[in-house]
């Protein structure tokens, strides 16, 4: 039985971890995940999906704010793991930790060397890519630059958003890891170096990324909305208040960027730099998420054709 240390945080990671837990060839000695966070207006403490799964299986849990130089680092290095598996962990691994095990493998949600970094799925959708994928790669000091063990891809559909693509890629990543790990550990599967000249990056999403730019084409704004749903959610401004936009549809029409060009009891169409978008699901400041019909029956009823949002 191969003894593993698992490191990850979101549901993507938990899906991969569950695959390892269900496989008798592997023993998970401990998991390392991000600290619990206070979320929402009530500041409720939320544990990570990886922690929740580890609790259900009685696995030791480590949650350092920063792994490097921590007491937790000393403890996990003393567990005697053969190797490390990471999947969307969210922190760099100290070289001393990588050197302490026989192998260290990362499940990364992109087709490397494209989209190294922390938000590959967001960028794949926002950039209008036709496919996304997962790469199993060796971990080295440089971020997501290690040799590639295996790759698998899937089409990005017009109906996909970050949430749906995360779910698809988590399953692909789990299966790809379980399929390739035995051959990799036996030496039968030889890793392939990345072409570093082709590397692109997907830095973590900042608040500035969330703001919609209505001067872009309707396809670009549409992709941006999908690439922010369900988190952190794209937004524009209505009378100085933030208006989150969860869903929209491509529409025809012309007008100034951000201008209301169609308003009925059931629809609100906004012009973009090229074409237009029909808003479907929105969330006004201080209100719950709602359909555009409910919005137009409430706060949105004051909007008129010719008004401009986003200012």
From Swiss-Prot:
Taxonomy, superkingdom: Bacteria
Name the record gives this protein: Methionyl-tRNA formyltransferase
Species for this entry: Streptococcus pyogenes serotype M49 (strain NZ131)
Entry's family note: Belongs to the Fmt family.
Any single Pfam family the record assigns to this protein: Formyl_trans_C
Cellular component GO terms, alphabetical: cytosol
Lineage of source species: Bacteria, Bacillati, Bacillota, Bacilli, Lactobacillales
EC number annotated for this UniProt entry: 2.1.2.9
One example GO MF annotation: methionyl-tRNA formyltransferase activity
Xref: CDD domains: FMT_core_Met-tRNA-FMT_N, Met_tRNA_FMT_C
Protein keywords: Protein biosynthesis, Transferase
PROSITE patterns attached to this UniProt entry: GART
The protein's enzyme class: transferase
Cited SUPFAM superfamilies: FMT C-terminal domain-like, Formyltransferase
Binding site for (6S)-5,6,7,8-tetrahydrofolate: 110-113
Gene assigned in the entry: fmt
Entry annotated with the keyword Protein biosynthesis: yes
Function: Attaches a formyl group to the free amino group of methionyl-tRNA(fMet). The formyl group appears to play a dual role in the initiator identity of N-formylmethionyl-tRNA by promoting its recognition by IF2 and preventing the misappropriation of this tRNA by the elongation apparatus.
Annotated catalysed reactions: L-methionyl-tRNA(fMet) + (6R)-10-formyltetrahydrofolate = N-formyl-L-methionyl-tRNA(fMet) + (6S)-5,6,7,8-tetrahydrofolate + H(+)
Gene3D superfamilies: Formyl transferase, C-terminal domain (3.10.25.10), Formyl transferase, N-terminal domain (3.40.50.170)
């Amino acid at each position: 039985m191969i003894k593993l240390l698992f490191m990850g945080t979101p549901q993507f990671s938990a899906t991969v971890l569950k695959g390892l837990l269900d496989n008798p060839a592997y023993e998970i000695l401990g998991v390392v995940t991000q600290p619990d966070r206070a979320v929402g207006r009530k500041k409720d403490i939320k544990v990570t999906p990886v922690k929740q799964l580890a609790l259900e299986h009685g696995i030791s849990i480590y949650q350092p704010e920063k792994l490097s130089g921590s007491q937790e680092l000393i403890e996990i290095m003393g567990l005697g793991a053969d190797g490390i598996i990471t999947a969307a962990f969210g922190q760099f691994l100290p070289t001393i930790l990588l050197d302490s095990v026989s192998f260290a493998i990362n499940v990364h949600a992109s087709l490397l060397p494209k989209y190294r970094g922390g938000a590959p799925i967001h960028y794949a959708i926002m950039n209008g890519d036709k496919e996304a994928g997962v790469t199993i790669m060796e971990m080295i000091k440089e971020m997501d630059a290690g040799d590639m063990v295996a790759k698998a891809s899937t089409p990005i559909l017009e109906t996909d958003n970050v949430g749906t693509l995360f779910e698809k890629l988590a399953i692909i990543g789990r299966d790809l890891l379980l399929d390739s790990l035995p051959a990799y550990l036996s030496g039968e599967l030889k890793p392939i170096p990345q072409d570093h000249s082709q590397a692109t990056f997907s830095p973590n999403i900042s608040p500035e990324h969330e703001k919609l730019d209505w001067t872009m084409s309707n396809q670009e704004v549409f992709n941006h909305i999908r690439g922010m749903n369900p988190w952190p959610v794209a937004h524009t401004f209505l009378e100085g208040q933030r208006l989150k936009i969860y869903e929209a549809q491509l529409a025809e029409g012309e007008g100034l960027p951000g201008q209301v060009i169609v308003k009925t009891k059931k629809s609100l169409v906004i012009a973009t730099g090229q074409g237009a978008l029909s808003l479907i699901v929105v969330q006004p400041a201080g209100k719950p998420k709602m359909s555009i019909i409910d919005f137009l029956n409430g706060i949105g009823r004051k909007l008129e054709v010719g008004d401009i949002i986003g200012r």
